């Protein structure tokens, strides 16, 4: 049971208290993190019964709409997290956006770490549906950042044009972007850039505040796939993540632009390792080394990342729980992409395709963004190895089609662990 003082130092209460005490306490994060956050549930009385508030989801096609029932809504509607976040705030983005024509979206977000506990009766089935059977009530997630275990990590660069690995991390004790105050968002930025200043060697770099960039500089970074896009996506706008834009947002990158940190977009931080060409092993090695060093530097300053053994690393959208990892390549496969078996091959290899510029974009010059489907239930090493093995299979298929040979649909990979 958390002490009264530790409860006082949760979320917005902490921000207000620390604001009166000065930034020196905020910088260390010491008081806030002495005890794990306690998901103390409280009730917020409403004027109307739950049935009067229940959203109309009859035309919706997202995970939240499929899992939410009047009974679950009635049970959870009046509950509030210690930071004041409600069920209606969690689901608003899914209510406002019925669904995507090609991708089944999640339809809900978390406002803080406690949301996943307070509203578990909805989050757990949504997670199970989104992650193809991963049940957070009975399963545990594993983490493995040992890049030396990776094999066959060099792609044929005639086909693979670039390689990238990314993840997200959230700072415990501060609300997530849908619910954070301006003070909390600025504190995320402060904690992150103070830690990043300690990076050395090939990881050393500098921070660029979005509010200090010209429109031209921003667009150039976006076009080069270094910077997150402007806040126009329904996920960001309807969930409240675009508030106060561009305050306390920015990008940190090393001098080679191969190791990047996005700050205060969809998550507190997004950690990215990327480079031109097909050396995925080197990209993942840099990713693991940089991520471990960032975590060490943040812990030195009295903070820690949100994590638990049920859900792995805690992020805003349930789709990114677990590793939060997306390993992807830009690969040119003109013949395979036109083969009717292409989608089934991807499905069996646990891979997904996007256009050259990401979701909702076309494949330019037959270049596709290919990445892992899964995020949770497998370790980082396993997911990257799946991408390596799968992309090598796709390239081999492309070569066979070039020679006029037949290709085969591989047997499906098991979803969780080795069978």
Swiss-Prot record:
Residues modified as Phosphotyrosine: 255
Classification via Pfam families: ATP-gua_Ptrans (PF00217), ATP-gua_PtransN (PF02807)
Keyword Transit peptide: yes
UniProt superkingdom: Eukaryota
One of the record's GO cellular component terms: mitochondrial inner membrane
Annotated organelle transit peptide span: 1-39
Tagged with keyword ATP-binding: yes
A GO BP annotation: phosphocreatine biosynthetic process
Phosphagen kinase C-terminal domain boundaries: 159-401
Keywords noted in UniProt: ATP-binding, Kinase, Membrane, Mitochondrion, Mitochondrion inner membrane, Nucleotide-binding, Phosphoprotein, Transferase, Transit peptide
Domain Phosphagen kinase N-terminal, residue spans: 46-132
Enzyme Commission number, as recorded: 2.7.3.2
Entry binding sites for ATP: 162-166, 225, 270, 326, 354-359, 369
Any one GO molecular function term: creatine kinase activity
Role summary: Reversibly catalyzes the transfer of phosphate between ATP and various phosphogens (e.g. creatine phosphate). Creatine kinase isoenzymes play a central role in energy transduction in tissues with large, fluctuating energy demands, such as skeletal muscle, heart, brain and spermatozoa.
Family: Belongs to the ATP:guanido phosphotransferase family.
Oligomeric form and interacting partners: Exists as an octamer composed of four CKMT2 homodimers.
Descriptive protein name: Creatine kinase S-type, mitochondrial
Gene expressing this chain: CKMT2
């Amino acid at each position: 049971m958390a002490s009264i003082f530790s409860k006082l130092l949760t979320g917005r209460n902490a921000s207000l208290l620390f604001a009166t005490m000065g930034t020196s306490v905020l910088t260390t994060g010491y008081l806030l993190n002495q005890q794990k956050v306690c998901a103390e549930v409280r009730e917020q009385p409403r004027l109307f019964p739950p049935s009067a508030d229940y959203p109309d989801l009859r035309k919706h096609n997202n995970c939240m709409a499929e899992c939410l029932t009047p009974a679950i809504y009635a049970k959870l509607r009046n509950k509030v997290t210690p930071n004041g976040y409600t069920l209606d705030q969690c689901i608003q983005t899914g209510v406002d956006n019925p669904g995507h024509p090609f991708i089944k979206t999640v339809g809900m977000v978390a406002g803080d770490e406690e949301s996943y506990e307070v509203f578990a009766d909805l989050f757990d089935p949504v997670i199970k549906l989104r992650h193809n059977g991963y049940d957070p009530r009975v399963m545990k997630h594993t983490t493995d950042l040992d890049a030396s275990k990776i094999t066959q990590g060099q792609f044929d660069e005639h086909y693979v044009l670039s390689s990238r690995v990314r993840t997200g991390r959230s700072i415990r004790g501060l609300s997530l972007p849908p619910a954070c105050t301006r003070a909390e968002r600025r504190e995320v930025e402060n904690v992150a850039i103070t830690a990043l200043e300690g990076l050395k060697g090939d990881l050393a770099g500098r921070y660029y505040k979005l509010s200090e960039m010209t429109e031209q500089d921003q667009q150039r970074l976006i076009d080069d796939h270094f910077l997150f896009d402007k806040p126009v996506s329904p996920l960001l706008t309807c969930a409240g993540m675009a508030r106060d834009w561009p305050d306390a947002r920015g990008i940190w990158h090393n001098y080679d632009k191969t190791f990047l940190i996005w700050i205060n977009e969809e998550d507190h931080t997004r950690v990215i390792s990327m480079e031109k060409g097909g050396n995925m092993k080197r990209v993942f090695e840099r990713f693991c080394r940089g991520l471990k060093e960032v975590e060490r530097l943040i812990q030195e300053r009295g903070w820690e990342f949100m994590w638990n053994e049920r859900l792995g690393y805690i992020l805003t959208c349930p789709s990114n729980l677990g590793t939060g990892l997306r390993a992807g390549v830009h690969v040119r496969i003109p013949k395979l992409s036109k083969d009717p078996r292409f989608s089934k091959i991807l499905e069996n290899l646990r891979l997904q395709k996007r256009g050259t510029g990401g979701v909702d974009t076309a494949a330019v010059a037959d270049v596709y963004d290919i990445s892992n489907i899964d995020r949770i239930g497998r370790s980082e090493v396993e997911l990257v190895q799946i991408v390596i093995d799968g992309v090598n299979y796709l390239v081999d298929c492309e070569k066979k089609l070039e020679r006029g040979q037949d290709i085969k649909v591989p047997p499906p990979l098991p979803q969780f662990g080795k069978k």
